Design a protein with these regions (language model features):
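Core catalytic lobe of class I
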Residues: 1-250, 257
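SAM-dependent methyltransferase catalytic region
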Residues: 12, 264-265
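Conserved phosphoryl-transfer catalytic core
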Residues: 256-262
C-alpha cells in the first residue's frame, strides 16, 4: 500500500481488494510463493496501514482463498486483521460453482428441470481433497456495528406471499444473505491477470457498504482495474495501486473503454 499511508489526509469509505494468496500464481512482478511468515507479516502491514486511512464508518472487504494443504490460511489472515484492530462484521462466501439436484429443489419451486452444475472452477487433481468451489470475503469494520444496505444487494422473493407476511418485507426484495454465487469468466484472453475476481464481486460489496455522495473506494491491489470498473458503474470515486506496469496499462485501457461505453448508453 505505497499510495495511501496514515500520513495522507484522504480518508477512504470502503476498501475492496483481493491480495495475492501466496499459492504460486504466475505474477510477473511479484513472488507468490513467499515464506509463510513473511507473507503474513506483509499482510499485517496492509492491515495496519489500511486501518489508518479508513473512515470511522468505513468497510474493508477482503477476498481471500486458500488451498487444501493449508486450509487455515484464510482464517490466519482474518486473525491478523482482527489483531490490527478491525472487527469482523460479516463473513461472505463467494461461490464460484454449484451443483443442484432437482430432488433438492422440491416440486413447489419449479426453478430447474434437470440436475444442473452451474459456474466454473479449477479442479484439484487429488485423491485426498475435494475441489474448492468457494472463497471468503471478510467484511471488516472499525467497531463491528456499521449499518449496511442489505436490500441494495437484495434478491426478489421466491415466494411472493412473504411480501405481506413479514413486517419487514415492504417490497419484493429480501436479504441476499452471506452466500454469493458469482461465476467468473473462464476465457484466459479476457483475464490477462492470473487472479482477477468478477466485476460483480466488488460491485456488490460497494453497494452493501452503501453508496453516498462523494464515496471513495480504494483497491490496494487493483490489478487490471476490476474494482475501478465497478466504481464507474456505481458512479463513485476510486483509487488504486498496482506494482506491475503491464497491469496498470491494461487497467487504464479498461477504465477508458468503460467511460466511453457508459457515455454511449
Amino acid at each position: 500500500m505505497s499510495l495511501l499511508k496514515k500520513e495522507d489526509t484522504i480518508k477512504i469509505d470502503a476498501i475492496v481488494t483481493s491480495p495475492p494468496y501466496n499459492i504460486n500464481k504466475p505474477y510477473s512482478k511479484y513472488n507468490d510463493k513467499r515464506d509463510k511468515n513473511e507473507y503474513l507479516l506483509w499482510l499485517q502491514k496492509v492491515a495496519n496501514n489500511s486501518l489508518q486511512i479508513l473512515k470511522e464508518d468505513g468497510s474493508f472487504f477482503l477476498n481471500v482463498g486458500g488451498r487444501p494443504t493449508d486450509y487455515m490460511l484464510p482464517f490466519e489472515i482474518c486473525s491478523i486483521f482482527i489483531g490490527a484492530g478491525y472487527k469482523l462484521q460479516n463473513t461472505i462466501h463467494w461461490i464460484k460453482s454449484i451443483s443442484i439436484e432437482v430432488a433438492d429443489i422440491g416440486k413447489k419451486n419449479n426453478i430447474i428441470k434437470t440436475d444442473s452444475s452451474i459456474g466454473h472452477f479449477k479442479p484439484i487433481i487429488s485423491q485426498r481433497f475435494l475441489s474448492d468451489l468457494h472463497e471468503y470475503i471478510f467484511h471488516f469494520t472499525k467497531k463491528g456495528d456499521l449499518a449496511i444496505d442489505k436490500l441494495a444487494v437484495g434478491v426478489t422473493y421466491q415466494d411472493k406471499s412473504n411480501i405481506g407476511r413479514w413486517k419487514s418485507a415492504k417490497t419484493d426484495k429480501r436479504d441476499r444473505g452471506n452466500i454469493w454465487f458469482i461465476p467468473y469468466n473462464t476465457i484466459q484472453e479476457k483475464r490477462p491477470h492470473p487472479a482477477t475476481f468478477p466485476e460483480k464481486l466488488p460491485y456488490l460489496c460497494i453497494k452493501l457498504h452503501g453508496v453516498k455522495k462523494n464515496t471513495i473506494i480504494y483497491d490496494p491491489f487493483i490489478g487490471i482495474g476490476t474494482t475501478a470498473l465497478a466504481c464507474i458503474n456505481l458512479n463513485v470515486e476510486f483509487l488504486g495501486t498496482e506494482i506491475d506496469n503491464r497491469y496498470i496499462e491494461i487497467a487504464n485501457e479498461n477504465i477508458q473503454l468503460r467511460y466511453i461505453k457508459n457515455k454511449k448508453t
